[in-house]
């Protein structure tokens, strides 16, 4: 009887073994063959909304999973350079960060593709917004009021942050009023200033601090300030115009001479240099210039082929339409550096 039962069990055991092997083989096949059907993107926070929409359309069309991790642009880059994390695409709010931090060790090429400008966002709950709406040139005087809370993002982590610092420096030159710099930056933070010939250098320590009881609020990335403005926790924040449009916030435009959105004033913008991460081996000097977003695929991208296909899709008509709608229009001609991969040359052109 025992022998008979053992004979019955044997086919069952063999069947289970076959099933387990088949399952493991299937899992191995799935994990190894779906690995190329995903893309990992580290992106600037201000790119999150248009990238999400483009990724959704691409995924729907090609069945590819796209993971977008948003942060400040400098922080996005340091995830790769300092933390050793894997990514396929890096998309930043200042294309110059790519040659500064990533070329030549992580990539040999990049594309500058979209523009923006910095504005001051607010709501109907913001103190003195009626004055601002009637007299936009009073913006810096309103920010100087002790009962007004305002903010910008961390210049050591986010381009909108160092651009906000630079804009305050440019405003002090444009309005010929040194009190702007003193009251909005120097008296509220440990940021320092030095004048070198006609250039204003604003020095941002790596351990940036805000004075106690200050009405200035700093957050890691510019989009982190949106919820504070919407809730009335702060009255005003420096943001990209695209962020204001995407979040349906009121905003006032700053003069073209200081908003970093008009290439005509590139020379004037360059009168201010912001030094970030001062006191570390990562210290960089960033001259103010017109805002241009940049993008690249890393040399060691784990899903390089798929990432290049997605980038071609992004730089094409679909991407152009979405970015235009979100307030970040594409350049008439892309800025191209390095030997662009063959897959992109028909749409991005050659090195300029």
Curated annotation (Swiss-Prot):
SUPFAM superfamilies: Periplasmic binding protein-like II (SSF53850). The keyword Metal-binding does not apply. InterPro entries: ABC_trnspt_W-bd_WtpA, ModA/WtpA. Gene3D superfamilies: Periplasmic binding protein-like II (3.40.190.10). Residues 1-22 form the signal peptide. The keyword Signal applies. Keywords: Signal. One of its GO terms (biological process) is molybdate ion transport. Coiled coil: none annotated. This is Uncharacterized solute-binding protein Smar_0280. Belongs to the bacterial solute-binding protein 1 family. WtpA subfamily. One of its GO terms (molecular function) is molybdate ion binding. PANTHER family: MOLYBDATE-BINDING PERIPLASMIC PROTEIN, MOLYBDATE_TUNGSTATE-BINDING PROTEIN WTPA.
């Amino acid at each position: 009887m025992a022998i008979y039962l053992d004979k019955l069990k044997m086919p069952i055991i063999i069947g289970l073994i076959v099933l387990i092997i088949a399952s493991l083989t299937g899992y191995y096949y799935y994990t190894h063959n779906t690995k190329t059907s995903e893309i990992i993107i580290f992106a600037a926070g201000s790119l999150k909304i248009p990238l999400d929409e483009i990724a959704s359309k691409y995924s729907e069309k090609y069945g590819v999973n796209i993971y977008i991790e948003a942060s400040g642009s400098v922080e996005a880059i340091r995830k790769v350079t300092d933390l050793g994390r894997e990514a396929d695409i890096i998309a930043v709010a200042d294309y110059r960060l790519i040659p500064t931090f990533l070329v030549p060790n992580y990539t040999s090429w990049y594309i500058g593709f979209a523009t923006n400008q910095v504005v001051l966002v607010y709501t109907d709950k913001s103190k003195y917004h009626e004055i601002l709406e009637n007299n936009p040139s009073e913006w810096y005087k309103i920010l100087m009021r002790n009962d007004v809370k305002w903010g910008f993002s961390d210049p050591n982590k986010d381009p909108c942050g160092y651009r906000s610092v630079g804009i305050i420096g440019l405003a002090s030159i444009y309005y010929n009023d040194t009190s702007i710099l003193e009251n909005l930056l120097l008296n509220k933070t440990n940021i320092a200033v030095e004048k070198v010939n006609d250039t204003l250098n604003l020095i941002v320590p790596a351990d940036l601090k805000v004075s106690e009881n200050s009405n200035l609020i700093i957050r890691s990335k510019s989009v982190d300030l949106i919820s504070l403005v919407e809730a009335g926790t702060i009255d005003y924040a420096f943001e990209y115009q695209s962020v204001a449009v995407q979040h349906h916030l009121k905003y006032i435009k700053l003069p073209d001479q200081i908003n970093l959105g008009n290439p005509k004033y590139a020379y004037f913008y360059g009168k201010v240099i912001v030094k970030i991460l001062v006191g570390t081996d990562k210290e960089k000097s960033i001259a103010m210039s017109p805002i241009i977003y940049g993008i690249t695929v890393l040399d060691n991208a784990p899903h390089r082929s798929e990432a290049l296909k997605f980038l071609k899709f992004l730089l094409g008509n679909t991407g152009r339409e979405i970015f235009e709608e979100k307030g970040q229009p594409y350049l008439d001609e892309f800025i191209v550096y390095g030997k662009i991969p063959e897959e992109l040359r028909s749409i991005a052109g050659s090195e300029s």
